[in-house]
UniProtKB/Swiss-Prot annotation:
GO terms for cellular component: cytoplasm. InterPro entries: Cyt_trans-like, PPAT, Rossmann-like_a/b/a_fold. This is Phosphopantetheine adenylyltransferase. Reversibly transfers an adenylyl group from ATP to 4'-phosphopantetheine, yielding dephospho-CoA (dPCoA) and pyrophosphate. Its main location: cytoplasm. It is found in: Cytoplasm. It comes from Clavibacter sepedonicus (Clavibacter michiganensis subsp. sepedonicus). It catalyses: (R)-4'-phosphopantetheine + ATP + H(+) = 3'-dephospho-CoA + diphosphate. The record marks H18 as: Transition state stabilizer. The lineage of its organism: Bacteria, Bacillati, Actinomycetota, Actinomycetes, Micrococcales. The gene is coaD. Its cofactor is Mg(2+). One of its GO terms (biological process) is coenzyme A biosynthetic process.
Length: 163
């Protein structure tokens, strides 16, 4: 039986921390779906389609195996998507105790609803301080985001800023 895991997130934009979690999760599971989810509580900087395209490019540039794919999910519970693709694990990157506290109740509900386990991966210390919201803030103020995001993302944001 293939072990399928899902790495969900808004990835707005995808960061080096995200890539680190994706890379490590790809070694742990037979198939990995990087799932770009629509969060109705957030107004995204990048449209969903652009985020999917960027993650596909980042995964290709990183040389990750074909067992890693990208998808999107805009409606319904995350566990509904997991059922649809046969995934039994959600992989979440957690940078701090605050992230663990935020993720724990959702992990328990996901296990109750669909017997989907949540695995929390700690970040590479070099990226522990990086978040998409930090990148958005730096970018909005005209700062250099290259230290925090894959090259494809830095290029796309520079093009977007140039107009």
């Amino acid at each position: 039986m293939q072990r399928i895991a899902v790495v969900p997130g808004s990835f707005d934009p995808v960061t080096l921390g995200h890539l680190d979690v994706i890379r490590r999760a790809a070694r742990l599971y037979d198939q990995l779906v990087v799932l770009v989810v629509h969060n109705p509580g957030k107004t995204p900087m990048l449209p969903l389609e652009d985020r999917v395209d960027l993650i596909e490019r980042v995964i290709r540039d990183a040389g990750l195996p074909a067992t890693v794919r990208v998808d999107s999910w805009g409606a319904g519970l995350l566990v509904d998507y997991c059922r649809q693709v046969g995934a039994t694990v959600l992989v979440k990157g957690v940078r701090s105790q605050l992230d663990v506290a935020y993720e724990t109740p959702m992990a328990l509900v996901n296990r109750d609803l669909a017997d989907v386990e949540t695995v929390m991966l700690l970040p590479d210390p070099a990226h522990a301080h990086v978040s998409s919201s930090l990148v958005r803030q730096v970018e909005a103020l005209g700062g250099d985001v290259a230290p925090y995001v894959p090259a494809a993302v830095a290029e796309a944001l520079a093009v977007r800023r140039a107009g």
